[in-house]
Design a protein with these regions (language model features):
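Feature captures the catalytic ectodomains and active-site-proximal regions of enzymes
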Residues: 1-435
Length: 435
């Protein structure tokens, strides 16, 4: 609550360009957005408490929007074809998390949680208009203003244009042992929850943040040289909403009304709207209100996007990298990978080898653990193994009715992935030494 009530917006008066307004939002006002979101999560059902807080927030937001739309003509989205450009110039071992609805304040929280352990580069992207999923995911994956409704088609186009063998998966499916050189991970939980539960989803957002923190950490520990976090759009929250708060979609001619934007055939002259010329089916223009409030529509109110406020348009373009370690660690590897392509029988051995050439006193031993995966699921693991310089150890595991296994060797303390092996079960029968 203190962040909201003690916020000082005086520096907004010195913002005389669009870029300075953007900087004011990312450096200062995004904290207010986070504060009101947390207050909604705690008090949304207690109108006597939340309404005065919401009204104060809206007064601050009104000041911001006045400046935002004053310099809005300088706005130019840089979202079109972003992933194409990124992967064309990318080197192997790059992972990109493409979120749906990751507002800037969420990404800022994630970055603050990780910057103590990793190198964080915080850049911003300006989302396209209208700031909705189909339109802006197409902008990221395809570019040139082309909109592809089916996500698999966007992925196929990105692979074709970038010329890279990109692996696509849902973020939740990530597991140690994945070895793709170029990886795109989809994370749609924020937008899915928002669309389904509206403001009821607010209480879940902190869990989504923890998932992203955990997965970015895991990717870097798996050996990815850089992990990027981007999204299609942000969102606004309407809070306590009365019928009188909703905006009338008074457009002339044929129109298509959404909660945060309107498509029209004819050009409109409403000074309370911001519009651009954009063809979409039979429509020629798209308009959004110069406000965070929704149009009267068939949509569900609470969580929404599609408009052109800073909360919807200013989005993260963050990257994360590991700092070089100040001290060396004992190198431990799986030494029998070549012998594991065709294993006869229901059991297999994993042999570990610790480097014998180390001269660093602090690298004389290392605690490791072996994890066993089948179909992306962790089915078994070893106890913690302490490896000393030059030492060898062997651990036996069962296939557990699986034909193929991925073995992952982890550092116990850092959870860094040290080595990976693929183990395949042979179709030949184990004759127990009878031959």
């Amino acid at each position: 609550m203190n962040t909201l009530m003690e916020f000082n917006s005086s520096s907004l008066t010195t913002c005389h360009t669009f870029d300075k307004v953007v900087a004011f939002y990312t450096e200062h006002f995004s904290k207010v957005d986070r504060a009101i979101r947390n207050l909604y999560a705690a008090f949304l059902q207690e109108k006597a408490i939340i309404r005065p807080l919401q009204e104060y927030y809206e007064s601050l937001n009104y000041e911001l929007l006045q400046k935002w739309f004053e310099y809005r003509p300088e706005y130019q989205s840089d979202q079109q074809g972003y992933l194409i450009s990124l992967f064309k110039n990318a080197k192997p071992r790059i992972a990109v998390i493409v979120g749906d609805g990751i507002r800037y304040e969420i990404s800022e929280y994630i970055a603050q949680a990780l910057e103590k352990k990793f190198k964080v580069d915080k850049q911003i992207m300006l989302a396209d208009m209208p700031s909705e999923t189909e339109h802006n995911m197409s902008a990221l994956y395809v570019g040139n203003g082309e909109v592809l409704p089916v996500h698999k088609d966007r992925e196929k186009r990105l692979t074709e244009i970038s010329g890279k063998a990109i692996t696509y998966m849902d973020l939740e499916a990530l597991s140690y042992g994945d070895t793709a050189d170029y990886l795109v991970l989809n994370y749609g939980d924020i937008d899915k929850a928002g669309e389904k539960l509206q403001q009821g989803a607010i209480k879940l957002f902190s869990e989504f943040e923890l998932v992203l923190i955990d997965k970015i950490t895991q990717l870097l520990n798996m050996g990815y040289q850089e992990v990027h976090l981007i999204t299609d759009h942000g969102f606004v929250l309407t809070g306590v909403l009365d019928e009188a708060d909703k905006l009338s979609p008074d457009a002339t001619g044929t129109k298509e009304v959404h909660e945060r934007f309107i498509r029209t055939i004819d050009k409109q002259s409403n000074s309370a709207w911001f519009g651009v010329k954009e063809s979409h089916g039979e429509y020629n223009y798209v308009y959004a209100a110069k406000s965070h409030r929704p149009f009267k529509s068939k949509g569900c109110y609470g969580y929404s996007h599609g408009g052109v406020t800073p909360q919807e348009i200013i989005i993260p373009k963050f990257s994360f990298r590991k700092e070089k370690a100040a001290t060396s660690e004992l190198e431990v590897t799986i030494s029998n990978k070549k012998e594991s392509n065709e294993v006869i029988g229901d059991y297999f051995d994993i042999k570990l080898q610790a480097d014998s050439k180390t001269t660093d006193l602090f690298a004389s031993q290392r605690k490791v653990q072996i994890l066993i995966y089948a179909g992306g699921v962790n089915i078994s693991s070893s106890s913690i193994i302490t490896m000393k310089s030059g030492e060898r150890q062997s651990v036996e595991f069962s296939f557990q009715d699986n034909l193929e296994i991925i073995v992952v060797l982890l550092d116990v303390e850092t959870r860094e992935q040290l080595d990976v092996a693929n183990i395949k079960k042979s179709n030949a029968r184990d004759l127990g030494g009878l031959l």
